[in-house]
Every structure is written in structure tokens, then in C-alpha cells.
């Protein structure tokens, strides 16, 4: 009978967890508090509401020591008027705000990407996404800029809701599995978009699994297409091969070699 490294994988996923009492979280929250206060001061009457979303809100963000591209997503919902402003207007407002408070200050940098304005502060990216909100068929609907210069609908809490439901349904193994997979993804140069990877992993069926079985299952479900870059296909194939080797050494009751193969894909 094969031995298990379930506890080892769970501990490893905890290592990839950005803990609430960590110094990194304290710095992030301090910067967020200042950022929100500055938004209130500068654009207060123009803003309807603002809220954190993304991996930070879903509790799947990785520490910077693992993922150099970890970022904090902030949705800024503007008040709309009878005179409809374009998405670019709201983005420009955020850019002017960011330049005023953060450009070349505190060692920070401001970048106008799409559809956000990014403030790089203390090695953390804070992505400010402009949005508007309208009542449609009795329900509030959020819109963010699209690449055509107009608006597109969005539901920033959709993945969080699905993830929370899945994590509860499958005995709290989904978030650890996501952290393991995201750690592999970022250390291999992001063959998958982080958001799309989380969405995919959230939708899998982990019935009866523990972290080990669920992680091995999730690796097996990764796929690529003929049109994907060869580098992506190679990285996914390499991960699958490494996990096959892990399974083989577990069958041989050799946890040392199993872990060696595991860490060909996952950071220690």
C-alpha cells in the first residue's frame, strides 16, 4: 500500500498562505488604509463605493516570496450622472489621483495598464479598477471598461462565492490545492492566467479527496491545446511527469524521493 504525503502537502500549502498576522499583511493593510483615505479625500464625492476583490479577498493570494506578481485589486465604483462619461474619463481620474499621491513618492511607481491604474508601492501592486453601477431588471449590475472603449458587465464576487461553496463542500481542501497550483504556476512563469486557473480549479469535483488526492487529480485535469505556446505545453507535461514520479515513489514507500520529485514543480 502506498504511503501518503497528504499532511506534507497541506503543510506546504500553509507555507504558501499569506497569514493574517504576518508582517506582509500588516504592511498591505496599512497601505490599503492610506490608499482608501486618500481616495476619500481626493475623489470622495465622485465615488459611490469601493471594495477589495480578487485573490486577496478570496484568501488565495500568495506571499511575495513565492509570487512576485501578487497584487491587490480595488474596485472603484463612480457615481454616474445624466451626462454619461466614458470609461477612459474614470481611468484618467484614477491616474491623476495616483500621480498626485504616489508618483515618485515613497519609492512608488504609477502605471496606467488596462483596465486598471496600478500603484506599485512597497513591492506590492495595487490595481485600481474603475467601474459604474446601474439598476437592471431590479438588480444592481457592475460594469468595467472593455477594450473597445465601452463597458462590459462583471461580477467580481462570482469566483469568491463559487470557491467558498466548493471549499465547504469538499472539506476545506480546495483553497490549499489552489495555493499549491498557483505556486507551481508562478514559479514556472505563469503558463496559465492566475484568475483562469483559480476558476478552473474551483469547478473540479473533489468528492472523497484529501489534499494529496485532490492535488494529483487537479494536475491530471490540466490541459493545453495545439495552439498554446510550446513552452506552456512543455511545462504542463513536465508537471504531470513529475507527479507521476511522486506517485511511483509513494508506491515504493520512498517519501524522500517522492518529495524530491514534488519539488521539481513546487517551491520549498
Feature locations, PLM:
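Extended, alpha-helix-rich binding/interface surfaces that flank or overlap catalytic cores
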Residues: 44, 62, 116, 120-180, ...
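Glycine-rich, often proline-containing surface loops adjacent to acidic residues and nearby aromatics
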Residues: 69-78, 156-161
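A generic structural motif
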Residues: 78-84, 206-208
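Conserved nucleotidyltransferase catalytic core and NTase-mimicking acidic/glycine-rich helix/loop elements
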Residues: 173-268
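Conserved catalytic core of two-metal-ion nucleotidyltransferases
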Residues: 39, 91-139
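N-terminal regions immediately upstream of nucleotidyltransferase
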Residues: 1-69, 81-88
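An acidic- and aromatic-residue-enriched active-site/binding cleft used to recognize and process polar
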Residues: 53-58, 77-80, 122, 131-133
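Extracytoplasmic/secreted envelope proteins and their assembly/folding machinery
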Residues: 29-32, 36, 91, 95, ...
